[in-house]
C-alpha cells in the first residue's frame, strides 16, 4: 500500500511541478533583420533580439528550411560593416525564405473588390464564418471608402505541388478548455504511426496566458516526440468587436498597436524557450495594405487557408487546413476527427520548399 501511495505521489509531484513551470523574464525584445554567420559557417537571418538573465539572444531563421532557433548573440558572427551585410543579403536573395517573404507581402491591385452588402458575417464565440458573393474565386479584397480590407491574404496552400496537407490550428482567446479529445487523438495517432505528427498552432498571447496548463501540456507532447509543432504568431489579444464593420475590426481596430500585438506573442514564446516561426496568421484572416506592409518588416509570411472546414471548404493536396483548437468552433473539429488517420500531414515549412529539396 505504501508503494502505491508513493507512486501516486511521484506522479502528482511531476504533473504539478510541470504545470507551475514559470516563464523566464524577457526584456528588450525587438525586431531586426540581420544576416549572421553561425558556428558551423551557415548564413542565417536574425529576426529578433532580446535579453534574458542579462544575456543577449537572437531568434534565427534558416533561409533554406524556415527552421528557427534561439542562440546566444556571442555565438554568431555579425557583418563587419554595411557592405558585408549587403553582400550577405544578396547571397540570400534566392533562398526559399526570401522568395516567400517577397511573394506573400505584396498586394495585387488587380484583385476584384466587393461592397459591404455583398457578404454577411456570422460570429460565434470569437469565431468568424464568412459568406460572400464573388465573381472570382481568387479575389480576397473588399474596398471600404479609402481603405482596402483584405480577407484571407497570404499563403492559403503550398507554393509547390505536394502529396499531403498542412494542419493549422487556431488558438484564439477563449474562456473554454481546449479541444482535449482532438489533441489526444493526434498523440494516439503518433503512437500508432511511431512518428511525431506535424501540426501548426497559430497561438494568441492571451490564450497562452489564460490556458497555461494546456499550453504546457502541448509543449510536453512536443518534447516527448508525439507532436511536431510549428508555433505561429496569431497576435496577442486577437481583438474582435461584434458591432463593428471589418475595416474597424480585428487588428484593423487599432493599427497603431500592431507592433505590440505582434511582439508580445513572440516575447511569451521565447520566455518558454520556444523559437517563434517566421509565419503569422491575421485574426479573422482580416488585414489591409498597411498591416501587410508592416508584416514584412517583422520578417513574417502571412498564412491564410483554402480549407477552413467549418466554412465547408474541401481539403486537397497542398491545402492549409484550418480548425480551431480552443473549443470555439466545434464544427471544424467534428469534421477533422474522422479524417485524421487518412490525411498525410506535413510540416508547414515544407509548403514553401521546392519538392526536389
From Swiss-Prot:
SUPFAM superfamilies (UniProt xref): Glycoside hydrolase/deacetylase
KW Signal (keyword) present: yes
InterPro entries hit by this protein: Glyco_hydro/deAcase_b/a-brl, RPE3
Signal peptide stretch: 1-19
Entry's Gene Ontology BP terms: carbohydrate metabolic process
Keyword set, alphabetical order: Signal
Gene3D superfamilies: Glycoside hydrolase/deacetylase
CDD domains assigned: CE4_RC0012_like (cd10963)
Cysteine disulfide links: none
NCBIfam families: RPE3
Protein name in UniProt: Uncharacterized protein RP012
Organism expressing this protein natively: Rickettsia prowazekii (strain Madrid E)
Amino acid at each position: 500500500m505504501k508503494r502505491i501511495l508513493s507512486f501516486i505521489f511521484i506522479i502528482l509531484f511531476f504533473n504539478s511541478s510541470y504545470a507551475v513551470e514559470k516563464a523566464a523574464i524577457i526584456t528588450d525584445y525587438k525586431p531586426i533583420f540581420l544576416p549572421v554567420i553561425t558556428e558551423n559557417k551557415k548564413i542565417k537571418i536574425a529576426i529578433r533580439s532580446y535579453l534574458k538573465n542579462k544575456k543577449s539572444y537572437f531568434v534565427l531563421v534558416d533561409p533554406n528550411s524556415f527552421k528557427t532557433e534561439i542562440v546566444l548573440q556571442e555565438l554568431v558572427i555579425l557583418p563587419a560593416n554595411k557592405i558585408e551585410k549587403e553582400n550577405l543579403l544578396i547571397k540570400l536573395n534566392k533562398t526559399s525564405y526570401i522568395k516567400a517573404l517577397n511573394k506573400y507581402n505584396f498586394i495585387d491591385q488587380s484583385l476584384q473588390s466587393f461592397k459591404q452588402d455583398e457578404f454577411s458575417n456570422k460570429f460565434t464565440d470569437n469565431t468568424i464564418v464568412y459568406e460572400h458573393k464573388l465573381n472570382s474565386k481568387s479575389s480576397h479584397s473588399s474596398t471600404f471608402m479609402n481603405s482596402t480590407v483584405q480577407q484571407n491574404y497570404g499563403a492559403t496552400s503550398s507554393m509547390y505541388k505536394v502529396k499531403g496537407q498542412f494542419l493549422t490550428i487556431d488558438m484564439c482567446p477563449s474562456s473554454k478548455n481546449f479541444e482535449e479529445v482532438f489533441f489526444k487523438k493526434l498523440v494516439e495517432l503518433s503512437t500508432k504511426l511511431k512518428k511525431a505528427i506535424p501540426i501548426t498552432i497559430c497561438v494568441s498571447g492571451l490564450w497562452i496566458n489564460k490556458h497555461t496548463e494546456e499550453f504546457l501540456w502541448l509543449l510536453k507532447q512536443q518534447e516527448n516526440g508525439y507532436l511536431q509543432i510549428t508555433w505561429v504568431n496569431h497576435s496577442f489579444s486577437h481583438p474582435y468587436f461584434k458591432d463593428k464593420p471589418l475595416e474597424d475590426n480585428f487588428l484593423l481596430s487599432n493599427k497603431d498597436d500592431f507592433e505590440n500585438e505582434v511582439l508580445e506573442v513572440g516575447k511569451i514564446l521565447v520566455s518558454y524557450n520556444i523559437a517563434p516561426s517566421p509565419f503569422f496568421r491575421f485574426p479573422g484572416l482580416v488585414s489591409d495594405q498597411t498591416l501587410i506592409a508592416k508584416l514584412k518588416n517583422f520578417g513574417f509570411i502571412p498564412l491564410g487557408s483554402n480549407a477552413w472546414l467549418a466554412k465547408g471548404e474541401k481539403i486537397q493536396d497542398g491545402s492549409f487546413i484550418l480548425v480551431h483548437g480552443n473549443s470555439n468552433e466545434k464544427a471544424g473539429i467534428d469534421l477533422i476527427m474522422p479524417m485524421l488517420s487518412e490525411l498525410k500531414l506535413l510540416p508547414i515549412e515544407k509548403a514553401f520548399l521546392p519538392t526536389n529539396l
